Curated annotation (Swiss-Prot):
Pfam families: Toxin_12. This is Mu-theraphotoxin-Pn3a. Belongs to the neurotoxin 10 (Hwtx-1) family. 28 (Jztx-11) subfamily. Its main location: secreted. It comes from Pamphobeteus nigricolor. GO terms for cellular component: extracellular region. Negative results: shows weak effect on hNav1.8/SCN10A (IC(50)=50 uM), and no effect on rKv2.1/KCNB1 (tested up to 300 nM), alpha-7/SCN9A nAChR, alpha-3/SCN3A nAChR (up to 10 uM). Shows no activity on hCav2.3. Shows no or very weak effect on Cav3.1 and Cav3.2 calcium channels and on Kv1.7 potassium channel. Keywords: Disulfide bond, Ion channel impairing toxin, Knottin, Neurotoxin, Pharmaceutical, Secreted, Toxin, Voltage-gated sodium channel impairing toxin. One of its GO terms (molecular function) is ion channel inhibitor activity. The record marks 17-18 as: May bind to extracellular S3-S4 region of the domain II of Cav3.3 channel. The presence of a 'disulfide through disulfide knot' structurally defines this protein as a knottin. Gating-modifier toxin that targets both voltage-gated sodium and calcium channels, with described activities on hNav1.1/SCN1A, hNav1.2/SCN2A, hNav1.3/SCN3A, hNav1.4/SCN4A, hNav1.5/SCN5A, hNav1.6/SCN8A, h/m/r Nav1.7/SCN9A, hNav1.9/SCN11A, hCav1.2/CACNA1C, hCav1.3/CACNA1D, hCav2.1/CACNA1A and hCav2.2/CACNA1B channels. According to Deuis and colleagues, shows a preferential activity on Nav1.7/SCN9A (Nav1.7/SCN9A (IC(50)=0.9-4.4 nM)). Another study shows a much less potent activity on Nav1.7/SCN9A (IC(50)=1457 nM). The keyword Secreted applies. It is found in: Secreted.
Length: 35
């Protein structure tokens, strides 16, 4: 399962599509992509 916005993460692959891992804060945030 992928992590949604503000979910815990270690790397970008942990997050759902269009989300990337903010390594400093360890949460998923939008990566500014639409496709």
């Amino acid at each position: 399962d992928c992590r949604y916005m503000f979910g815990d993460c270690e790397k970008d692959e942990d997050c759902c599509k269009h989300l990337g891992c903010k390594r400093k804060m360890k949460y998923c945030a939008w990566d500014f992509t639409f496709t």
